[in-house]
């Protein structure tokens, strides 16, 4: 029998589901921060058999050319809520799915490309969730001739998403890429209804 998602997982999903923008930050510091949009669009519950999302990150001036796309599966585990991260085969076919539900509906389950070692672990802390990459420094990303591991820190509230991603050299642990000016501060422009388990599941 399938275990129903926890209340914390459903709350995390509800807060994640939306269209986020760092417009205020970009206007206040235009030489430092570009105006970025982040979409977390809920997937049908049947896609993963649990709560899941499609995401894309794109510059506000070109919503049809995301520079980051992913699929995300939310799971209750000991120690927190795990968000497994996946790439998409032929991701360009689904560009724009963050703001176009018709494109979202075309994403097949067989396009998943697991990102090993790249799960995010979230824990509830009062009126927010804090997340970071699973331990081990195994989320590897090639960049500028180096193999780097991802260090990602996220704080999520009902209306905000604050994130800082950095790539660290595997050997020296010095920063190779990512923001030098601090985290990106996003505010939710629009919320989306999160995916819910079908009636009769759980127990």
UniProtKB/Swiss-Prot annotation:
Signal peptide: none
Keywords in alphabetical order: Lyase
Molecular function (Gene Ontology), one example: lyase activity
Keyword Lyase on entry: yes
EC number: 4.-.-.-
Pfam families: CpeT (PF06206)
CDD domains assigned to the protein according to its UniProt record, in alphabetical order: CpcT (cd16338)
Its biological purpose: Covalently attaches a chromophore to Cys residue(s) of phycobiliproteins.
Family under the similarity heading: Belongs to the CpcT/CpeT biliprotein lyase family.
HAMAP family assigned: Chrphore_lyase_CpxT
Name of the protein in its database record: Chromophore lyase CpcT/CpeT 3
Organism: Gloeobacter violaceus (strain ATCC 29082 / PCC 7421)
Organism taxonomic ancestry: Bacteria, Bacillati, Cyanobacteriota, Cyanophyceae, Gloeobacterales
């Amino acid at each position: 029998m399938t275990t129903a998602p926890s209340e914390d997982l459903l709350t995390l999903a509800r807060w994640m589901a939306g269209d986020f923008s760092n417009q205020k930050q970009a206007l206040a510091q235009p030489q430092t921060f570009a105006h970025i949009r982040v979409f977390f669009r809920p997937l049908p519950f049947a896609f993963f058999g649990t709560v899941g999302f499609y995401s894309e990150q794109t510059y506000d001036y070109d919503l049809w050319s995301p520079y980051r796309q992913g699929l995300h599966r939310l799971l209750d585990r000991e120690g927190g809520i795990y968000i497994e991260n996946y790439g998409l085969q032929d991701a360009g076919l689904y560009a724009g799915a963050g703001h176009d539900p018709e494109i979202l509906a075309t994403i097949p389950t067989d396009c998943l490309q697991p990102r090993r070692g790249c799960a995010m672990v979230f824990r509830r802390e009062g009126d927010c969730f804090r997340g970071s990459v699973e331990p081990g420094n195994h989320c590897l990303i090639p960049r500028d001739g180096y193999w780097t591991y991802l260090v990602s820190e996220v704080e999520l509230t009902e209306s905000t998403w604050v994130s800082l991603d950095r790539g660290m050299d595997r050997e020296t642990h010095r920063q190779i890429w990512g923001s030098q000016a601090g985290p990106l501060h996003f505010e939710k422009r629009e919320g989306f209804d999160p995916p819910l388990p079908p009636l009769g599941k759980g127990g």
